[in-house]
């Protein structure tokens, strides 16, 4: 469970399904407003330690967006008191004028006063909806970027001497899918295909840095090697080089 302050008036709380279960809640509980849900909201606010700007602010509005694996709760400060007092409605007519009003006129006047009083809340809700749309767009963009990541990387290393190539092969302990050996312009080129899908994002850079301790990183592409280079080993090159005494 984590909290993010989006603005002076809005917080976003992300709650995983596991967190919900630990607190005896499920997504269905949010579909119909109930006392249990409200108690849960205020309990997590106490647990997460609200910013000082949200303390003692009166009424809070909650907006829930269920997701497949989590629930996003947007919390907005309200500028209207939960218990409306006629004394707060300063633009209401005085008692003499009220006495001369018909019931319809009184209701219309009261509705206008309340509408003016709640204008800030309406704007807050509209702002919250815009924030929610932006959050969803950002999440979608991040998911699309993640899906476009290639699960495999080809590393291409260059060696001036065959002995250096063999020495490097004997240092390789990381997992690889396959490897190839080419010769072009009196140099040896080793291609190594690595599956990075289940590794943390820094792994490819870390692996390249480790390879550079023993070899030169090449900017020659695999397609160039395939077209102009001489294929010495078309697969499992590293494993075969490791067998050389």
From Swiss-Prot:
Alphabetized GO MF terms: protein-macromolecule adaptor activity
Q: Specify the signal sequence span.
A: none
Which Pfam families does the protein's record reference? MecA (PF05389)
- Source organism, top-level taxon: Bacteria
Tell me the PANTHER family matching this sequence: ADAPTER PROTEIN MECA, ADAPTER PROTEIN MECA 1
**HAMAP family assigned:** MecA
To which protein family does this belong?
Answer: Belongs to the MecA family.
Oligomeric and partner information: Homodimer.
What is the UniProt domain comment for this protein? The N-terminal domain probably binds unfolded/aggregated proteins; the C-terminal domain interacts with ClpC.
NCBIfam families attached here? PRK02315.1-4
Q: What is this protein called?
A: Adapter protein MecA
Q: Which organism is it from?
A: Streptococcus pneumoniae serotype 4 (strain ATCC BAA-334 / TIGR4)
Taxonomy, top ranks, is:
Bacteria, Bacillati, Bacillota, Bacilli, Lactobacillales
Which gene is the coding source of this polypeptide chain? mecA
């Amino acid at each position: 469970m984590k909290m993010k302050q989006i603005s002076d008036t809005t917080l976003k709380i992300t709650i995983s399904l596991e967190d919900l279960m630990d607190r005896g809640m499920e997504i269905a509980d949010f579909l119909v407003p109930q006392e249990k849900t409200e108690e849960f909201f205020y309990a997590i606010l106490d647990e997460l330690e609200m910013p000082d700007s949200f303390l003692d602010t009166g009424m809070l509005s909650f907006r829930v967006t269920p997701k497949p694996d989590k629930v996003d709760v947007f919390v907005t400060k309200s500028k209207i008191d939960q218990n409306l007092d006629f004394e707060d409605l300063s633009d209401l007519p005085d008692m003499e004028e009220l006495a001369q009003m018909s019931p319809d006129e009184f209701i219309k006047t009261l509705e206008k006063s309340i509408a003016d009083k709640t204008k800030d809340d309406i704007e807050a809700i509209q702002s919250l909806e815009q924030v929610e749309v932006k959050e969803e767009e950002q999440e979608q963009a991040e998911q699309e970027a993640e899906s476009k990541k290639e699960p495999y990387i080809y590393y291409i290393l260059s060696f001036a001497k065959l002995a250096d190539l063999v020495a490097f092969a004997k240092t390789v302990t990381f997992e690889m899918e396959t490897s190839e050996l080419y010769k072009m312009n009196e140099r040896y080129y080793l291609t190594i295909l690595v599956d990075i899908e289940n590794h943390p994002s820094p792994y490819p850079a870390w692996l390249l840095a480790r390879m550079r301790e023993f070899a030169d990183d090449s900017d020659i592409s695999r397609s160039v090697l395939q077209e102009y280079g001489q294929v010495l080993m078309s697969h499992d090159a590293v494993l075969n080089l490791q067998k050389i005494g």
